[in-house]
Design a protein with these regions (language model features):
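Short, surface-exposed loop and linker segments with low hydrophobicity and enrichment for Pro/Ser/Thr
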Residues: 127, 136-140, 246-249
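Alpha-helix capping at helix-to-loop junctions
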Residues: 110-114, 129, 141-144, 168, ...
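Conserved adenine-binding aromatic site and its adjacent loop/helix in ATP-hydrolyzing domains
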Residues: 106, 137, 160, 164
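Clamp-loader machinery-focused feature within the broader ASCE/P-loop NTPase space
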Residues: 1-130
Length: 332
């Protein structure tokens, strides 16, 4: 399963929630339904995977970390274990359909070789309404030994009936000093760590990817170039066209963060960490040009654009909507 680094690299902000879950499991009090929430890149999958490895490890006991050497640990590390099923969309951005949930329900109902059978749904907010209804029946009457772990960065998209059947385990972003201390193990350059922290919007695993994976760094640089273009009245249209080369799930949250930075600059004269990633003169001109009211309107629109990111809205229409909003939002 993904995000399963060696335990020496297990994110420290996940230790406490992991330990609490393991203690409950050892005491026979682990809920049959868990909803792990938190921002994308905070470590939900890492928490889930380490929890399952600890519970299935043939050597670990109490709150000891998984050994990483037994057959169960090796199987989970390789992404295959007979008692664990990972349910994901067939393609990123697609829905999880009802037939997939029915197969998962059948998996949970089969007797296995151990006491634990786990279904991990990643991300749970990809369930369509029929799939969610099929899952609800299992959450209401789970088979003996079954544990369902739902992960979601957008839990509000889940039906209330699903959320109410799960115990919520929320993972907040760690404080910036703790995050940057952890990131320092991957890049000793403090300025690079600060840039990755800002670019990731404080999401730890996303920040690590920016530091260690050239493709993620290139994606951030591409997004920054697009956003910088939106700040320039003469470059809005080319920047909007360039959005087609970017991923909405990374660009739109950064667009929202940029507008928050601009509002902060307009109201306090201060530049926050994300805003400091852009030319100061361009930010200042953008703030003067749109004024507090125009910035507030753009920020409200940005929330809507981000909500639309998981919908089948034509990217061309979104691009045009953003361009028109930036061109027409001027007002003091």
């Amino acid at each position: 399963m993904s995000e399963t680094a060696a335990d020496s690299g297990f994110p420290p902000w996940l230790e406490d929630p992991w330990r609490r879950l393991v203690e409950r499991a050892r005491a026979g009090r682990l809920p049959s339904g868990l909803l792990v929430t938190g921002a994308s890149g905070v470590g939900k999958a890492a928490l889930t995977d380490r929890l399952l490895r600890a519970l299935l490890c043939q050597r670990a006991s109490g709150t000891e970390p998984p050994c990483g050497e037994c057959n169960a640990c090796r199987s989970l590390g390789g992404g295959v274990h007979p008692e664990v099923l990972l349910l994901q969309p067939e393609e990123p951005g697609k829905e999880i359909v009802v037939d997939a949930v029915r197969e998962a329900n059948e998996f949970l109902s089969l007797s296995g070789s151990g006491d634990l059978r786990a279904l991990v749904i990643r991300p749970a907010d990809a369930l369509n309404i029929n799939a969610a209804n099929a899952l609800l029946k299992t959450l209401e009457e789970p088979p003996a030994g079954a544990v369902l772990i739902l992960e979601s960065s957008r839990p509000a998209r889940l039906p209330a009936t699903i959320r109410s059947r799960c115990q919520i385990v929320d993972i907040p972003n760690p404080p910036v000093p703790a995050l940057q201390a952890w990131l320092g193990a991957f890049a000793p350059d403090a300025s690079a760590v600060a840039e990755a922290t800002a670019a990731s919007l404080g999401r730890p695993l996303a920040a690590r990817e920016i530091l260690t994976d050239p493709e993620h760094m290139e994606a951030w640089q591409r997004d920054r170039e697009i956003l910088s273009g939106l700040l320039d009245a003469q470059a809005v249209l080319p920047a909007a066209v360039a959005m087609q080369r970017s991923l909405p799930e990374t660009l739109l949250p950064r667009l929202q963060a940029l507008l928050v930075s601009a509002q902060r600059l307009a109201l306090t004269g201060e530049t926050d960490a994300f805003g400091s990633q852009f030319p100061a003169d361009r930010m200042a001109r953008f703030v003067r040009r749109h004024g507090p009211r125009g910035l507030a309107r753009l920020a409200a629109r940005a929330i809507g654009w981000q909500r639309q990111a998981g919908t089948p809205l034509n990217p061309q229409l979104r691009m045009e909507d953003i361009a028109l909003a930036f061109i027409g939002a001027r007002s003091g």
